[in-house]
Amino acid sequence: VYKRQDNARTPMQWNHQEHAGFTTGTPWLSVNGNYKEINVENSRKNPDSLFSYYKTLIALRKNNDVLIYGKFQLLDKEHPEIFAYERTLDGKKIVVICNFTDHETQMEATEDLTDGKILIHNQGQNRLGKEKWILGAYEAWMIEIG
């Protein structure tokens, strides 16, 4: 038996106008009450929005051969909380470190990232040192080496 998913959905919140700019008619489902603050139009204007973050990630991937064609290597397969890997190509290296937990965690550094170029990060202060990498809850970094 298939159940409808209407309770899990709301109309797309495009802007601050009536019905969140989704329709000029009456929508089948009600619009979330936060549509005047949380909508696509506002997200596109905000450099700190999730929209802008993903736009930057997509641009990095499109314009960086290391991320497209580079050799992939996990940096610590056994770490229970941090997902860290590197991609290498033609003497260039990009290191990605992600903490998917709701608390601060750390791992032994596989290399010194202090002089690397930060391509993107989502929060916090850089605590990726020579001996250990410390990441806050849900923190992620992408750093270019060389």
Model segments located where?
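Carbohydrate-interacting/catalytic domains
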Residues: 3-146
